[in-house]
Amino acid sequence: MKISQFGSLAFAPIVLLQLFIVQAQLLTDSNAQDLNTALGQKVQYTFLDTGNSNDQLLHLPSTTSSSIITGSLAAANFTGSSSSSSIPKVTSSVITSINYQSSNSTVVTQFTPLPSSSRNETKSSQTTNTISSSTSTGGVGSVKPCLYFVLMLETIAYLFS
């Protein structure tokens, strides 16, 4: 009984070591930190209508201002009434892929505008939207592989103990 209990304690240093490695990766890899923010939680973004253009500027939070998202965004429906009493709405978009290429705090994405003759054409100069995304808890390529590696080491150690 005591031997098996001491054997189970051997997993603790392995787990702690892996957790330290993961934390070090997240602290030293700015892309991992940005991905953690972009993919790990719901964040408020602001779309700015540039007038005649269909381009919308997506302002990132200060935590991700060091990088620009150039990957694809899921299509969003831009709906709402042109009357001042109605608030235009943007449906939730999902970030499907992300590339970090330069230091910039904005990203340009395209929306399909309603016909100019439509009474529902959006005239608002500013709307907000919540983009919900993956439930990943860390940078892509750093947290999950390390977690699987820890589980693999624990399984092997258990089988040979």
Curated annotation (Swiss-Prot):
GO annotation, biological process: negative regulation of filamentous growth
Principal location class: secreted
Residues excised as propeptide: 140-161
Induction: Induced in response to cell wall damage.
Lipid attachment locations (GPI-anchor amidated glycine): 139
Localization terms from the record: Secreted, Cell wall; Membrane
Composition bias, Low complexity: 123-137
Membrane topology: Lipid-anchor; GPI-anchor
Post-translational modification: The GPI-anchor is attached to the protein in the endoplasmic reticulum and serves to target the protein to the cell surface. There, the glucosamine-inositol phospholipid moiety is cleaved off and the GPI-modified mannoprotein is covalently attached via its lipidless GPI glycan remnant to the 1,6-beta-glucan of the outer cell wall layer.
Leader sequence segment: 1-24
Disordered, as annotated region: 111-139
Disulfide cross-links: none
Glycosylation sites: 77, 104, 120
Domain of life: Eukaryota
GO CC terms, sorted: cell periphery; extracellular region; fungal-type cell wall; fungal-type vacuole; side of membrane
Record's keyword terms, sorted: Cell wall, Glycoprotein, GPI-anchor, Lipoprotein, Membrane, Secreted, Signal
Presence of the UniProt keyword DNA damage in the record: no
Protein name in the entry: Cell wall protein YLR042C
